[in-house]
């Protein structure tokens, strides 16, 4: 009976007494994750709203895995994953950090801790591109918050585990948070929560209050408590009384949920368990939970208090027990849908049935003060060897690799190879100028210089679909203090946007003004800090401003260039529309612009030019980006949602050695096409935000009047907060589901009684309302103080980017006047 618990934390020292089992010195000796078989690898991301406890939970994971000898603390600024000075001084995660560590001596976990602040959404987007599954951390006091809803939608296809954190805090409610989870994410779907463990409260001898001290393990029917004086000590007890009753009800509910989807468990329940819920083996339950989690039919739910070191080891167990390995996860999305892909249990993802084809994605670039530029990559198929010749199928460049590393947040471990499913780092002078975020790398798995043996037309043209970059919504002007500082400013800006592609630079050719654009005020504040303090740029900044764009509402004339030496190009610009037949589309940066190339007859024949098609394509893309940044005729803002169409009759001289002339020709054609377009064919666009407001019912009238009048908002819905969050029921019965999910009620404490009484009073006199609206960003930049005044400090709001929309005629002159 006790063996299972002893094995749960490998390498632990065990003391057994008559009534309890103590597991001491939890953790495991460090093992190189490079040696773990694919089936034992887990690529996970930690996602949540800001301040839910992502970094605190990650630091406990690293401590219990044996990576760190002390527990890092966000408040004291000594965390491993938040290693940037700005992160430690502000106590928030700014950029995603990757780290690899072992668990239970046999599993390797590659973890990416992502930011929770909405301004750093791109860090979450690119992390989701390379992970196989997620751990969603929820605040037990706040429940499901706005950014949690956003990252849940972004990670829709990824298997998930939910960890309800901060169960030790005043006002924490497991019941409320699980109900919130169901009502906001699972209503209208077939997905259900499965409570893997539930909170355990111990009554204090000097009061009537109950204190959160551990969890009840529903699968194994044990109580786990943590010693507050010793972070390494876990006490495992048998259940009795209320704990046993709650566990039995949760186990019955768990089995009822699992058997709706799992026929194997149904058979085990009826035959081997003889219809007795208590006789269903933990082994069968774990297997069923794993199977259904990977199919996104269920979401395992656990709880704890990471700051108090409670519940982290069971969470790590759930990660390796329930989440998929790289050979069980989603296949990567390739540009060529005809290329066969499948999973091989030995080598992982097999592309084009070629075991020697190695494909990797560069998803992040950082600049280390000692090592220089470092590129984070995810290996999807094959094996990457140090010293290999690699082909960048995005740029058409070929180069030799230097060192390979496995990341450990601020540090890294050198390795000779990276295998399918791993996340690693590339360093060295050869990669610095040859790889950018979103590039696909291809090489031969066993030969150092084996590119010639790969299929040139098929395998060397493969690309993993690019990482989506949301458009910036704020900008700040930047200029060097003196003319001599201009070059260093440009170099620093280039480093900045290479590391973070959600930042962009635009330049007004008429005024010479340079503008740094970003996702929000905090995003730009961090970027400015990094420019001045880390990259030592001697610059001055202007005022924060909304990032307006321009677009065209009709197609331009077709402009043509033809020369005697063999160059010919014809192009036009048109508003974005549905995909054009017999054309290929390539994204152009962050402004929803595209290059559309009609298929050229030369593509299906033997390539006759000295330079690769990728080199020609990248020159055209570069000229398109420059041409569109020049701006429109309303206020010279960069162009948005435009397509540049290259006609199929283009040609270049067969003996062309560099694509430099192509860049010049196409750029001039773009300038001419835009210059010939009449001013009335341009529209001004502004960022529109989704606004979520929570306010007392008594303030709805005044808030709505302000929104629709002064702020030009479009109201989408108004509903009771209780209709999207059911707090207090012991069961949740979703209309779409046939069974009732048992959720234990929260322990009755003086605090909860007071809170419940207050909530009852509020419900009877001042119901909370949730208003959803769309509003121009310009009209809401100073909304915090206004809402505080309108709601007497009782209102809360969150905003996130929705889209770019045409500025209405009644507001156009006002906006232009303020520029």
Curated annotation (Swiss-Prot):
Keywords, alphabetical: GTP-binding, Mitochondrion, Nucleotide-binding, Protein biosynthesis, Transit peptide
GO biological process: mitochondrial genome maintenance; mitochondrial translation; regulation of mitochondrial membrane potential; ribosome disassembly
Mitochondrion found in the keyword field: yes
Main location: mitochondrion
Deletion consequences: Results in loss of mitochondrial DNA. Causes a significant slow growth phenotype under normal growth conditions (glucose) and a reduced chronological life-span (CLS). Growth on a non-fermentable carbon source (gylcerol) is absent.
GO MF, one example: GTPase activity
InterPro entries, alphabetized: EFG2, EFG_II, EFG_III, EFG_III/V, EFG_V, EFG_V-like, EFTu-like_2, G_TR_CS
Residues binding GTP, per UniProt: 48-55, 113-117, 165-168
Domain tr-type G: 39-327
Transit peptide: 1-30
The UniProt record lists the keyword Transit peptide: yes
Protein location: Mitochondrion
Gene3D superfamilies reported for this sequence: 3.30.70.240, Elongation Factor G (Translational Gtpase), domain 3, P-loop containing nucleotide triphosphate hydrolases, Translation factors
Protein family membership: Belongs to the TRAFAC class translation factor GTPase superfamily. Classic translation factor GTPase family. EF-G/EF-2 subfamily.
Other remarks on this protein: Present with 1733 molecules/cell in log phase SD medium.
Primary role: Mitochondrial GTPase that mediates the disassembly of ribosomes from messenger RNA at the termination of mitochondrial protein biosynthesis. Not involved in the GTP-dependent ribosomal translocation step during translation elongation. Required for respiratory growth and essential for mitochondrial genome maintenance.
Name of the protein in question: Ribosome-releasing factor 2, mitochondrial
Organism: Saccharomyces cerevisiae (strain ATCC 204508 / S288c) (Baker's yeast)
Gene label: MEF2
């Amino acid at each position: 009976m006790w063996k299972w618990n002893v094995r749960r934390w490998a390498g632990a020292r065990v003391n057994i007494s008559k009534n309890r089992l103590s597991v001491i010195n939890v953790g495991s000796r460090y093992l190189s994750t490079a040696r773990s078989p694919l089936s034992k690898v887990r690529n996970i991301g930690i996602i949540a709203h800001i301040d839910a406890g992502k970094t605190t939970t990650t630091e406990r994971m690293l401590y219990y895995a044996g990576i760190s000898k002390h527990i890092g603390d966000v408040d004291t600024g000594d965390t491993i994953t938040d290693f940037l000075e700005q992160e430690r001084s502000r106590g928030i995660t700014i950029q995603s950090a990757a780290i690899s560590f072992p668990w239970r001596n046999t599993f390797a976990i590659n973890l990416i801790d992502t930011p929770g602040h909405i301004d750093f959404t791109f860090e979450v987007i690119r992390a989701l591109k390379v992970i196989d599954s997620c751990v969603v951390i929820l605040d037990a006091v706040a429940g499901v918050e706005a950014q949690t809803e956003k990252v849940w939608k972004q990670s829709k296809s990824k298997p998930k585990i939910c960890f309800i954190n901060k169960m030790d805090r005043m006002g924490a409610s497991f019941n409320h948070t699980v109900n919130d989870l169901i009502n906001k994410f699972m209503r209208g779907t077939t997905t259900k929560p499965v409570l893997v463990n539930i909170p355990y409260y111990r009554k204090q001898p000097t009061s009537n209050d109950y204190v959160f001290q551990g969890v009840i393990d529903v699968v194994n029917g044990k109580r786990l408590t943590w010693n507050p004086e010793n972070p390494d000590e876990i006490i495992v007890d048998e259940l009795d009384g209320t704990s046993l009753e709650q566990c039995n009800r949760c186990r019955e509910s768990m089995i009822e949920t699992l058997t709706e989807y799992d026929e194997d468990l149904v058979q085990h329940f009826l035959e081997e368990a003889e219809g007795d819920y208590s006789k269903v083996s933990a082994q069968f339950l774990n297997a069923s939970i794993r199977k259904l989690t990977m199919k996104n039919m269920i979401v395992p739910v656990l709880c704890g208090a990471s700051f108090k070191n409670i519940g982290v080891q069971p969470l790590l167990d759930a990660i390796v027990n329930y989440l998929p390995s790289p050979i069980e996860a989603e296949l990567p999305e390739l540009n060529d849908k005809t290329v066969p892909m499948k999973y091989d249990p030995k080598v992982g993802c097999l592309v084009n049935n070629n075991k020697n084809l190695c494909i990797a994605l560069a998803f992040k670039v950082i600049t280390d003060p000692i090592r220089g530029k470092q590129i984070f990559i995810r290996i999807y198929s094959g094996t990457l060897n140090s010293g290999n010749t690699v082909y960048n199928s995005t740029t058409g460049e070929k180069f030799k690799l230097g060192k390979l590393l496995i990341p450990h947040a601020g540090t890294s471990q050198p390795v000779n190879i990276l295998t399918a499913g791993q996340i690693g780092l590339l360093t060295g002078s050869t990669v610095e100028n040859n790889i950018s975020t979103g590039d696909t790398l291809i090489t031969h798995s066993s030969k150092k210089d084996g590119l010639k043996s790969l299929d040139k037309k098929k395998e060397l043209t493969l690309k993993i679909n690019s990482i989506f970059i949301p458009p910036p919504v704020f900008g700040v002007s930047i200029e060097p203090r003196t003319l001599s500082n201009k070059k260093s400013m440009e170099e620093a800006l280039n480093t900045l946007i290479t590391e973070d592609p959600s930042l962009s630079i635009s330049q007004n050719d008429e005024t010479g003004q340079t503008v740094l654009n970003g996702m929000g005020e905090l995003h730009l504040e961090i970027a400015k800090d990094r420019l001045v303090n880390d990259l030592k740029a001697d610059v001055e900044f202007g005022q924060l401003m909304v990032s307006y764009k321009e677009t065209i509402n009709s197609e331009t004339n077709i402009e043509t260039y033809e020369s005697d030496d063999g160059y010919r190009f014809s192009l036009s610009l048109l508003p974005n529309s549905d995909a054009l037949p017999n054309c290929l589309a390539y994204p152009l940066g962050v402004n929803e612009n595209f290059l559309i190339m009609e298929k050229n007859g030369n593509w299906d024949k033997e390539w006759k030019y000295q330079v690769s098609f990728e080199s020609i394509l990248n020159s055209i893309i570069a000229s398109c980006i420059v041409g569109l940044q020049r701006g429109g005729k309303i206020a010279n803002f960069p162009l948005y949602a435009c397509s540049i169409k290259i006609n199929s009759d283009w040609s270049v001289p067969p003996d062309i050695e560099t694509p430099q002339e192509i860049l010049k020709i196409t750029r001039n054609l773009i300038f001419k096409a835009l210059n010939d377009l009449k001013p009335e064919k341009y529209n001004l666009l502004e960022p529109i935000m989704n606004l979520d407001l929570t306010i007392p019912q008594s303030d709805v009238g005044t808030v709505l009047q302000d929104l629709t009048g002064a702020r030009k908002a479009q109201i989408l819905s108004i509903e009771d907060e209780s209709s999207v969050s059911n707090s207090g029921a012991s069961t949740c019965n979703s209309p779409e589901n046939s069974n009732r999910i048992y959720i234990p009620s929260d322990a009755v404490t003086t605090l909860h009684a007071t809170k419940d009484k207050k909530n009852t009073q509020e419900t009877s006199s001042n119901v909370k309302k949730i208003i959803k609206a769309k509003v121009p960003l310009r009209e809401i930049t100073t909304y915090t103080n206004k809402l505080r005044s309108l709601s007497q400090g009782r209102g809360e709001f969150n905003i996130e980017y929705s889209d770019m929309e045409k500025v209405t005629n009644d507001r156009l002159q006002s906006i232009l006047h303020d520029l």
